[in-house]
């Protein structure tokens, strides 16, 4: 449920409830207010793509330029530091646009007045975290200046990369104050005071009681923040901060330390690269060429356009690695075309929404990257393990579409189809067809790591879109890079805050306690996996998949390991299960994206998608209880 690239409930508030930032200003001040962070994001994103692409190519080209194996030792470290900078610098942009991964199932049902009061609470809570990390990070930098440390490769003083924390959280505070000022004007004095009083009530227990058991604080505050509408990442960070204040089990500057070190990781960098690759290739015309090829192959059959749509979604999944990105890129092309050929618009939107969920199963997949990092499992094996469930889901959706279309009399398009037209479509789509070869071939051929393959895919998409197809203009290119940076930042910050939350859970032995409780009920593997699947299906209906993975992996993984489940197999189960949440009412993000493209009512669309969800559940059961099938390629 995450993202044009990553969001389960990416909330982009509109109308009366959204005019948070200050009014537009003319001239240079207005431009700075709207765009201050964006040039840094564009420069940083392009820099890390080029640096890691250079690292990958130089490793092999350098062999011929110099004797022996060649390696550019500085590239990875420099790319990691730039990656951390752009991840946090993108958050102020998200604040200004009010785009975040959040649970809004309760928020959306509130009257407008209470929604506006809720925004006051959200801004104050977020501002509290930003100000705290800003203050803590200044202490960290002071310590680095007093006791200098340098990075291994670049010999860079660590206070320089650590500067990202005061700079970015300072900018967040500025953007939040802008948003809060605008929200105060909307709410008026009385409702603003109500919001501030509610914030004080939220914080009061931490300062009134001498000691509070940390577990109720951790989970109680997190639940409260979700209900209020605080973004999930910020809720995790605030709940962790509240627990530190209440229990005193960790130093107060712990949050700032982990905010940096938790994402100082090369494998995590695959996420922005895969997102950028999907954005570049979608805007660069590759999705349209893939659809033409799929239509050439399947368009003559009953329900041919629906079959072509599913096939295109499956292949585009190997480019974008994202469900909503696939729905947005493919749905904007196929839903109008299906309606034009006589298909019901609700069926058209449902097919695209369900097929878009395959995007997180077929590699590359951002959820697999997140799980691999969280569980310390092989990302390469996870990628391979997602292939069979993704193909089974696609084939099941195709079979249903064929049967339903035949029943409704939706025939294929009648036109000349022969070897010449097929080869022409293949030739037109050749650059898109090369992407899985580059990514998967590079990984499983031992040529590149998943992160390097992702960087090369982003570089490839950029070159094809700008110079081969020439559909990425300067303006659209700039917007694409900003979009990719912003989307990936929401995921990265979520992982950062979830690491803090998870570390406190580990200190308080929460995973061990839950594992003992569940295993006390039964040690039967079938029953344990059934309970976990039901839990994930419930959570997937209201929480974004990536958030669920980073929160639940530390809790559930010890349980399945105790009953003998392979961690790679469990990762596949988890991702296939949470993929169903992309299309599960009431908050499946694929449904919302598809309904927006089709101009279809979400209530009616939710009914039409139910048979497709049933098919996806059948694939989940096969994936869970016949491990040889998903593990066929994963070994």
From Swiss-Prot:
Cell inner membrane recorded as keyword: yes
Sequence intervals crossing the membrane: 38-58, 75-95, 117-137, 154-174, 192-212, 217-237, 266-286, 299-319, 350-370, 379-399, 431-451, 453-473, 481-501, 526-546, 572-592, 609-629
Gene Ontology cellular-component terms listed: plasma membrane
UniProt pathway annotation: Organosulfur degradation; alkanesulfonate degradation
GO process terms (BP): alkanesulfonate catabolic process
Annotated knockout phenotype: Cells lacking this gene lose the ability to grow with isethionate as the terminal electron acceptor.
Localization, UniProt: Cell inner membrane
Keywords: Cell inner membrane, Cell membrane, Membrane, Transmembrane, Transmembrane helix, Transport
Keyword Iron attached: no
NCBIfam families per record: dctM (TIGR00786)
Function statement: Part of the tripartite ATP-independent periplasmic (TRAP) transport system DctPQM involved in the uptake of isethionate (2-hydroxyethanesulfonate), which is then catabolized by enzymes encoded by adjacent genes in the locus. Thereby is involved in an anaerobic respiration pathway that converts the sulfonate isethionate to ammonia, acetate and sulfide.
PANTHER family attached to this UniProt entry: C4-DICARBOXYLATE TRAP TRANSPORTER LARGE PERMEASE PROTEIN DCTM, SIALIC ACID TRAP TRANSPORTER PERMEASE PROTEIN SIAT-RELATED
Subunit structure: The complex comprises the periplasmic solute receptor protein DctP, and the fused transmembrane protein DctMQ.
Protein name: Isethionate TRAP transporter permease protein DctMQ
Phylogenetic placement of the source organism: Bacteria, Pseudomonadati, Thermodesulfobacteriota, Desulfovibrionia, Desulfovibrionales
